[in-house]
Amino acid sequence: MKSLLTFILTTIFCIQQVWAADLAHGEQIFSANCAACHAGGNNVIMPEKTLKLDALEANQMNSVEAISTQVRNGKNAMPSFSRLTDSDIEDVANYVLAQAKKGW
């Protein structure tokens, strides 16, 4: 039983480390590709469509899948970032959601 508990705690710790690394990578991708228009969760082109949680929810963009699709394909004034890998896109989407939940 003790070894099972040790295994579970180790697994949880390792998963948390990977998650933190993914958010850090997402922040790097965001800074390099998104911050020019979306610094601080804002939107310099369409000010009403911010990355704040209430705006993401109102625009049905409050999931990793929805944000990833937008980043990959672009829409309206936002260009496509299809040159990013799927992993990069998923990391930046997770970062955006995490920041939105924190209030940027």
UniProtKB/Swiss-Prot annotation:
Binds 1 heme c group covalently per subunit. Its main location: plastid. Keywords: Chloroplast, Electron transport, Heme, Iron, Metal-binding, Photosynthesis, Plastid, Signal, Thylakoid, Transport. The keyword Hydrolase does not apply. It comes from the Eukaryota. It is found in: Plastid, Chloroplast thylakoid lumen. One of its GO terms (molecular function) is electron transfer activity. Residues 1-20 form the signal peptide. Pfam families: Cytochrome_CBB3. InterPro entries: Cyt_c-like_dom, Cyt_c-like_dom_sf, Cyt_C6, Cyt_C_IC. Heme c binds at C34, C37, H38, M78. One of its GO terms (cellular component) is chloroplast thylakoid lumen. One of its GO terms (biological process) is photosynthesis. Monomer. Functions as an electron carrier between membrane-bound cytochrome b6-f and photosystem I in oxygenic photosynthesis. Belongs to the cytochrome c family. PetJ subfamily. This is Cytochrome c6. It comes from Cyanidioschyzon merolae (strain NIES-3377 / 10D).
